[in-house]
């Protein structure tokens, strides 16, 4: 075998991956690698111990539109800030037949798609301040974080699961802003507030 794909429900990924890492065949793991951070840490240690190559499927970071947006920002003074809105439409989720374990850990099961974009655009996080609140969900359903990246860029993350909204990313330089809303569509805004499509 050249590689394995682990494409199972979020609450099964950890157990299956833990059994397959020692086989030492490269593994593509559908996100999340673990349904809670402790599970992910265990898998990292196991992979390091076995020297196995693994990749977690955060496909959105490979959208070509994002890389065009990064290029525009770099051509216009460089990245000063990144703002990610990762609102979930949780009122639609609660009526679906989703195991409680996944629902209670939705921030890891699904929201990490948008959280991952912070590191795609900003790089390694140097400092972070985070708050959470709970309207209905025991592990939180309202999240806000402000951070500074090693590069000096600052960033914010906001997510309100029971408020209408979608996923949005905005990048800031000192002369333009680039916005992805929805994530698959990009525009850039100049200092005259003119909007230009990113092709």
Identify the function of each model-found stretch.
Residues 60-129:
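Predominantly a Rossmann-like dinucleotide-binding segment in NAD(P)-dependent oxidoreductases
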Residues 12-13, 91, 164:
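Short glycine-rich, flexible loops that bind phosphorylated cofactors or substrates
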Residues 23-25, 50-53, 153:
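A short helix->loop->beta-strand "cap" motif at the edges of active sites that frequently abuts
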Residues 29-30, 54-56, 180:
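Hydrophobic residues in well-ordered beta-strands that form the structural core
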Residues 1-46:
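Beta-loop-alpha module in the N-terminal Rossmann-like domain of NAD(P)-dependent dehydrogenases
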Residues 135, 153-199:
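NAD(P)-dinucleotide binding in Rossmann-like oxidoreductases
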Residues 42-60, 78-83:
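Rossmann-fold dehydrogenase core element
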Residues 138-143, 149:
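A short, glycine/Asx- and small/polar-enriched loop/turn
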